[in-house]
């Protein structure tokens, strides 16, 4: 199946490669990220469990969902969790490569998916990276940087700061790419409202105070690109209340929002080779799409460019935090294609911080700082050079991702790359 309106995804090649080799594969990610569209292009039979009539048939006999020409795509499989066991049994019974594709917008609350380990391969899909938005052809490959050898860094970008900010608020959800202005804001508001009013309920949560969930999301958005404690986020969400909800009340919000892939924190990096003393372990906060954070905070491209400050528990200009979130989203997409993991580094007290650490399977790393602006000075690279001194040969390269016009290497070896010029 080919769709002329389809936006090619970095994950497409990975999906096709795995489908040729494994019998069952599940594609996970938030609603609207493009899972169904990517999977449907490879499927011969499609079962949509968000259609009541199809769900009723499958609920009567889960094995009926597996019938038909293969690959069989089972969309929104989590609406009837026994499907997972049916697929697992089919794999155990000898289903060949490329038999089943499952797509889901949530992780069920039970341990069903854990029992599929080794039988059903899982792939994560995120909103569009900057490369996938087709603003400019990249000149630098993240995979090449991970390969080491100091690849040549060159290229010029005509993507301006205004263009980057427009992309932050425009969203990486494929279905929203043609929208702007009021229509886009309305769709993003509707997306957020559905999370609070419907998705949490479908996940089995009784939401007694929907406004508190919305306020928690808003406080989390204000903490974008920080390691603010969840206690501080809870306090910010409930400021002004005489009696604050307990941690036990608010923790389920976070857990379910992570299972819906709306909350998408970057974990702390734990070195697998050289130990580094005094590393802290809190995650760095990000929502699935920085446009969701902007909408929750009422930010527009104009207010971001005017220097709007992040609300507590964030600090500093909001545009910097959201640009880092856009960069983190993009790097995570590219790193997955390169079979690498992404974390962040922060020592206790915050005296050393590196925004993104991309780790290869062998434990060697690519260290990345994110800088809003084009001019990169010695202060911007000091933590990168510190890490290089600390673990030496285990750093394959160091990078500053910027909004500047040119990609180049500094005399100290740090690569300066506009985000628009970085691709997979």
Language-model regions: role of each:
Residues 1-16:
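N-terminal pre-Walker A segment at the start of P-loop NTPase domains
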Residues 27:
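Hydrophobic anchor at the beta1->P-loop junction of P-loop NTPases
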Residues 35:
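Conserved lysine of the Walker
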Residues 38:
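Hydrophobic positions on the alpha1 helix immediately C-terminal to the Walker A/P-loop
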Residues 59-101:
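Conserved nucleotide-sensing/catalytic segment adjacent to the nucleotide-binding pocket
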Residues 105, 110-226:
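Interdomain motor-coupling "hinge/lid" segment immediately C-terminal to the ATP-binding subdomain
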Residues 181-364:
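Accessory nucleic acid-recognition modules appended to NTPase machines
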Residues 403-424:
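Domain-level recognition of nuclease-like catalytic cores that cleave nucleotide substrates
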């Amino acid at each position: 199946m080919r769709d002329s309106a389809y936006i090619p995804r970095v994950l497409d090649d990975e999906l096709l490669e795995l489908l040729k080799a494994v019998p069952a594969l599940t594609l996970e990610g938030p609603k609207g990220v493009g899972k169904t569209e990517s999977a449907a292009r490879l499927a011969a039979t499609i079962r949509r469990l968000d259609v009541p009539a199809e769900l009723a048939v499958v609920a009567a006999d889960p094995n009926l969902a597996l019938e038909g020409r293969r690959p069989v795509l089972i969309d929104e499989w989590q609406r009837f969790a026994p499907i997972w066991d049916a697929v697992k049994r089919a794999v155990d019974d000898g289903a060949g490569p490329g038999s089943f594709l499952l797509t889901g917008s949530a992780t069920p609350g039970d341990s069903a998916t854990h029992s599929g380990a080794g039988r059903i391969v899982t792939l994560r899909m995120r909103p569009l990276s900057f490369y996938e938005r087709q603003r400019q052809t990249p000149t630098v490959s993240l995979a090449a940087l991970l390969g080491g050898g100091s690849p040549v860094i060159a290229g010029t970008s005509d993507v301006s700061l205004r263009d980057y900010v427009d992309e932050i608020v425009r969203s990486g959800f494929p279905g929203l790419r043609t929208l702007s202005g009021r229509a886009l804001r309305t769709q993003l508001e509707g997306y957020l409202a559905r999370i609070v009013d419907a998705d949490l309920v479908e996940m089995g949560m009784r939401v007694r105070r929907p406004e508190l969930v919305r306020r928690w999301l808003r406080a989390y958005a204000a903490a974008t690109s920080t390691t603010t404690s969840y206690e501080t986020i809870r306090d910010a969400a409930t400021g002004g209340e005489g009696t604050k909800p307990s941690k036990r009340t608010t923790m389920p919000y976070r857990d379910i929002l992570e299972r819906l892939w709306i909350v998408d924190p970057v974990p702390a990096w734990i070195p697998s080779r050289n130990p580094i003393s005094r590393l802290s372990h809190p995650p760095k906060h990000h929502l699935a799409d920085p446009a969701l954070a902007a909408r929750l905070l009422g930010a527009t491209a104009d207010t971001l460019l005017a220097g709007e400050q992040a609300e507590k528990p964030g600090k500093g200009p909001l545009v910097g935090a959201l640009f880092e979130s856009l960069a983190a989203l993009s790097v995570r997409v590219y790193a997955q294609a390169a079979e690498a993991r992404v974390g962040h580094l922060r020592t206790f007290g915050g005296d050393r911080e590196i925004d993104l650490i991309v780790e290869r399977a062998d434990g060697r790393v690519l260290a990345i700082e994110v800088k809003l602006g084009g001019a990169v000075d010695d202060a911007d690279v000091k933590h990168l050079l510190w890490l290089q001194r600390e673990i030496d040969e285990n750093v394959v390269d160091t990078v500053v991702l910027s909004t500047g016009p040119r990609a180049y290497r500094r005399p100290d070896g740090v690569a300066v790359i506009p985000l628009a010029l970085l691709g997979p």
